[in-house]
Amino acid sequence: MGFWSFLGFSEDESSKQENVNDQLVRPEVNHDLALDLLRITMLVYNYDKNLTIEENTTIESFVSGIQSGGGIDSLDINDTRKEALGEVAKNVPTGKICKWISDDETDLQVGVTLSEGKKRICVVFRGSESRSDWYYDFMIFKETLRMDGLTKSPPVNVHSGFLSQLTTNNVYKTLVDTVKGLILEHPDYEICVTGHSLGGALSTLFGFMISHHVDNKVTVTSFASPRVGDWEWKKAFEVKSNLYHYRVTNYRDAITAVPMIRYYHVGNNIQLKDDKFEVFPLDAIRGWLDETLLTCWSASEHNVDLYYKRLTKNLW
């Protein structure tokens, strides 16, 4: 085994870099959809601290309630998040929060929303904020993923911390039951899964797992996600015919470079910069320096507000 292979890079990834701004191999994620999902992700970041949403409340009604009770300006959030909150109410006005899970043991927060106007069911994971979240982030050992539809040999191994947070206290089962119940009522709806940081990793893992339970199209749009699993995970993920992943990253975001040792990214990568974006499809040949801590070293580029500003600026 070569040195770069040991670090987690394939032979292709250790060769030359091939450029970008080409069409994605699979259908491109709609920019408006990506922006809507990021706005909902930003809303979830503030849910426990500032916001109260009853299940089946529309997003429009929720925002109207904030405005009548002192306005968005009364919230202890910055202007970027206030803007995102207002925009998501305008763009997904009849969206409903169908389920909200907040697990005290793992500090996981995840919501399930339904948009009849856009015919989609969204599962939205909150990103890393608490000490507990970072504890799961830094559990870098792998665990074999055991579920129907996966080969046992060779095993598919994923980040033990992410898997533990998703499956503790039946969170995963509750989410699957909720989504499958909504599919029974809306069989033609697309399933969208999203999150930022830890939420991005959880959305990637959840999207893969639920794609084995449903026939509907599952689209994962992750933001600032770390790597989730090994090479067998990557292969199993990218052959699923009903599963699509658009991995949105800031150019120098350090979190997207970890874990490094024998972990691999999955899906199409949309890389954001201040004045442009680049697209790396599934079969793109990347330089071995790409997405390592030698090139992705900035903690500030991990900020969800910067993702929002760049995604708003870079249209496709």
Residue ranges and their predicted role:
Residues 2-32, 53, 109, 117-120, ...:
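Serine hydrolase/lipase
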Residues 200:
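Catalytic nucleophile loop
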Residues 121-125:
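Short beta-strand element of the alpha/beta-hydrolase
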Residues 2-114:
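N-terminal low-complexity, Ser/Thr- and acidic-residue-enriched intrinsically disordered segments
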